[in-house]
Amino acid sequence: MSEETKEEIKNEKVDEEVTEELTEEALEDIVEEEINELDEAQKLATEWENKFLRVSAEMQNVQRRGNEERLQLIKYRSQDLAKKILSSLDNLERALAVEGLTDDVKKGLEMVQESLISALKEEGVEEVSYESFDHNIHMAVQTVPADDEHPADSIVQVFQKGYQLHERLLRPAMVVVAQ
């Protein structure tokens, strides 16, 4: 081989090595760029996933609250009607207390009263307890001194009955309380 041919082969080898080094550096740069882009894409995907999870949880909460409100509306649907019927029930009670009613009239009034009470009970309306004074369900309209027969905080007399629908108070009982 001639000197020139040897020199050409040597130059080709050097060119190949330089090209190989450049290609390796370029590949490393490209790989690094791709890794950075992938990291950004993963961050973006994680961010969108978190947003999706938050929105999904919020939707579940909205549905749950809507269901709870619907159940409350169903549970207390008869509240306004019950409040209006209570005054009629009071009037029936007053009418039954009148002296001189004939037995037929009295029996008719009692039947109407029982019918109203039964209808209210079916809807969940119940009379409040009168065992001892509870400011949550009773309204003290008068107090009397406590004695042996009526200890302190006991209810001496009920002026007007109180009612509740499930656990919600419709009307407090108006009572006389021993102090």
UniProtKB/Swiss-Prot annotation:
The lineage of its organism: Bacteria, Bacillati, Bacillota, Bacilli, Lactobacillales. Homodimer. This is Protein GrpE. GO terms for cellular component: cell surface; cytoplasm. Belongs to the GrpE family. GO terms for biological process: protein folding. Participates actively in the response to hyperosmotic and heat shock by preventing the aggregation of stress-denatured proteins, in association with DnaK and GrpE. It is the nucleotide exchange factor for DnaK and may function as a thermosensor. Unfolded proteins bind initially to DnaJ; upon interaction with the DnaJ-bound protein, DnaK hydrolyzes its bound ATP, resulting in the formation of a stable complex. GrpE releases ADP from DnaK; ATP binding to DnaK triggers the release of the substrate protein, thus completing the reaction cycle. InterPro entries: GrpE, GrpE_coiled_coil, GrpE_head. Keywords: Chaperone, Cytoplasm, Stress response. It comes from Lactococcus lactis subsp. lactis (strain IL1403). Residues 1-20 are annotated as: Disordered. NCBIfam families: PRK14140.1, PRK14156.1, PRK14162.1. It is found in: Cytoplasm. GO terms for molecular function: adenyl-nucleotide exchange factor activity; mannan binding; protein homodimerization activity; protein-folding chaperone binding; unfolded protein binding. The keyword Chaperone applies.
